[in-house]
A protein has these predicted regions:
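Surface-exposed amphipathic alpha-helical tracts and adjacent flexible/coil segments at the periphery
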Residues: 4-17, 26, 38, 42-45, ...
Length: 636
């Protein structure tokens, strides 16, 4: 969300809060911080696009006032249980619907290929197209996953403490929503798994070659892949029945608990309470002395139970009646009607929520006249004397690479930085802490954090924390939020235009990637393993020293473009853009107020890294094929 979009987003949230929405789902750090300060009583939920998949990340956002966390689709049952046991707020799980190959909130593929940002909800779904691994694209769809269905695991989720299910229905028809929601609601109410008939209905409603629950089970592989033919017929009979059902007046009734007191010489009193905590009390007629038959608690209960024709049903009733009194049936009915009417008003009344003034941004004090160059290397072998001779301000290496190093060359003014894995799990944190200790012993003094969950890992290490591109910094409010979290700088999103970066208030030293193959995806599935096969657990979560993923692997699309695949921590895959970003001959990036300009080296040799750095120092044009990225054209 850009700086110019934030005021309208805030106004929308204000109006939604006044209308009584239960919560606002937020992805952007800047908007989250702004809403927390201006609308402190409005519940906020963390979107799955915040890329939260550890209990540390969930606790971090909870400490800032978030009330529910939607965890990553890739989380297994074990991961989810760990988060539920260690997270102080509600946990929401993605239970049914389309799976992205990339971790949500980390995909640049749609933006860089088609100009539509998946991180802004405008994904053009390039993952549903054919690709070839080290071969021309044919009829294989290695990025297209089956839809997820966890209908058979609802009891397990309830037992571990999952609070909410997300049923994805983006771009789906209302009939689809009716079928899927209806089945899941029945399963929850009846505490059971789906029948074969219900499983068939879910598949008829929409699927891609069936469903998968592999992520939940902690497994992966090519069996998760699936496609859907564009000429797949609509399930007419199923959708007709669903349409007929939701067009009928079949609204579910709300259970209500009545407490009635009828005493001599005072008005009759009835209290009604619903499961959401709304409680109302009304008074009615004063009872008279009975002339013949006295009023009984049973007769009052019978009258109060008659809620037919209303949105309510009496689930429990407690009646206390003094002896020897009389109250007409009409008076009791009126008491019930008044109570239910008052309860309806209470249920529909918008909550009273504070609306505080918009806090000003801190002063734009971190705007630099010209950026210093920083480097990120994928391999230690890319380091050379020629590269060091160019005097970078900072060099970062992946933490799992630093773990195997015994020494780092030191230069005056050079900062060594550890790049933490973009994706990891709670079970990896002891290993990551050991690696951080080792990195510090080598002279590393800073760490790149691309996820909120990195922050608890880094506290107490003494390392300077720098925000990486995985945080999707899109506005000055996000910089302010991260500054409050203790970060010393932050890399802005490569989906921004030059003008948007220039106008962004620099309340924190800002960095931008100005060279390199931009990251398109990071995937839980290892694309090389899916195609060629290898033992996923050969060396724990670290990238294996041998195997097919260590050699050059290319994903090719229908146009022949080749996207390098790089192994990532946890046997994951990172897809790089087919062409490197080149801005050496464009002075624009030097005039944006950036403190740092990053050269991101991935597939380059040591000699190429040094030569490219020299080209940037001299402002030379590119020697080969390149892209200007999104800095000039922007994204939807």
């Amino acid at each position: 969300m850009t700086d110019r979009e934030l005021p309208q987003a805030l106004e929308t949230a204000v109006q939604a809060g006044r209308l009584g929405v239960d919560a606002v789902l937020v992805q952007d750090w800047g908007l989250f911080g702004l809403l927390r300060r201006t609308l402190p009583d409005l519940p906020l939920h963390a979107s799955t696009q915040m890329s939260l998949f550890t209990s540390g990340g969930a606790r971090e956002i909870a400490a800032d006032g978030c009330e529910r966390v939607v965890i990553a689709r890739e989380c297994s049952a074990e991961d989810t249980r760990t988060i539920c046991e260690n997270c102080p707020v509600e946990v929401e799980v993605f239970a049914h619907g389309a799976l992205c190959m990339c971790y949500s909130g980390q995909c640049g593929m749609s933006a860089l290929i088609g100009g539509r940002s998946g991180n802004r909800g405008r994904c053009a779904q390039p993952c549903r197209l054919p690709y070839g691994l080290n071969a021309p694209a044919g009829k294989a769809y290695p990025l297209s996953l089956k839809d997820s269905s966890l209908a058979g695991h609802l009891g397990e989720m309830a037992e571990m403490g999952v609070d909410c299910l997300k049923l994805e229905g983006r771009m789906k028809r209302p009939e689809y929503v009716a079928v899927v929601t209806g089945i899941y609601a029945r399963l929850l109410e009846e505490g059971r798994g789906p029948t074969p008939a219900e499983e068939a209905e879910l598949e008829q409603a929409f699927s891609r070659s069936g469903f998968t629950d592999a992520y939940w089970k902690g497994t992966h592989g090519r069996a998760m892949l699936g496609t859907r033919s564009p000429d797949t017929p609509e399930p007419k009979a199923l959708f007709d029945a669903a349409r007929a059902a939701y067009e009928k007046d079949t609204a579910r009734t709300v259970p209500v608990r009545f407490t009635c007191r009828i005493a001599a010489d005072v008005p009759s009193v009835l209290t009604a309470e619903d499961p959401d905590g709304h409680t109302v009390t009304v008074t009615g007629a004063v009872p008279e002395a009975a002339r013949t038959r006295a009023l009984t608690a049973e007769s009052v209960e019978e009258r109060l139970m008659k809620t037919g024709g209303t949105a309510y049903r009496c689930s429990e009733v407690t009646v206390t009646v003094d002896d020897g009194l009389s109250l007409s049936a009409g008076a009791i009915n009126a008491l019930r009607r008044d109570a239910l009417s008052a309860l309806s008003e209470a249920r529909t009344a918008p909550p009273v929520r504070r609306e505080l003034p918009v806090p000003p941004l801190p002063e734009d004090t971190c705007r630099a006249d010209a950026p210093q160059f920083t480097l990120s290397l994928h391999r230690a072998e890319q380091l050379s004397d020629g590269l060091l001779a160019c005097s970078p301000a900072r060099i970062s290496l992946p933490l799992d690479v630093l773990a195997h190093e015994t020494a780092l060359p030191q230069r005056e003014g050079l900062i060594w930085c550890a790049e933490l894995p973009r994706v990891w799990r709670d079970r990896d944190e002891d290993l990551l802490r050991r690696w951080l200790d080792h990195a510090a012993s080598l002279g590393v003094t800073a760490a790149l954090a691309g996820n909120l969950g990195h922050l608890p890992l880094l506290r107490g290490t003494g390392l300077t924390v720098l925000g990486d591109y995985g945080l999707n910094v899109f506005n000055g409010r996000s910089l302010a939020y991260l500054k409050d979290k203790g970060l010393a700088s932050a890399c802005v999103s490569f989906e921004l235009r030059f003008a948007q970066i220039r106008d962004m208030p620099k309340v924190l030293p800002a960095e931008a990637i100005v060279y390199g193959r931009l990251p398109l995806m990071i995937t839980e599935n290892c694309l090389v393993q899916n195609a060629a096969g290898c033992r996923r657990d050969r060396e724990g979560p670290a990238v294996p020293a041998d195997g097919p993923c260590r050699s050059q692997q290319l994903l090719r699309d229908r146009t022949g473009a080749a996207f390098p695949l790089l192994p990532a921590f946890g046997h994951r895959t990172e897809i790089q853009n087919s062409r490197p970003l080149w801005l050496a001959d464009r002075p624009d990036f030097r005039r944006l107020g950036l403190a740092f300009a990053r050269l991101r080296f991935t597939t380059e040799s040591a000699a190429e890294c040094a030569e490219i750095f020299r080209a940037y120092l001299e402002g030379r044009p590119a020697a080969g094929d390149f892209t200007r990225g999104l800095y000039e054209r922007g994204v939807e």
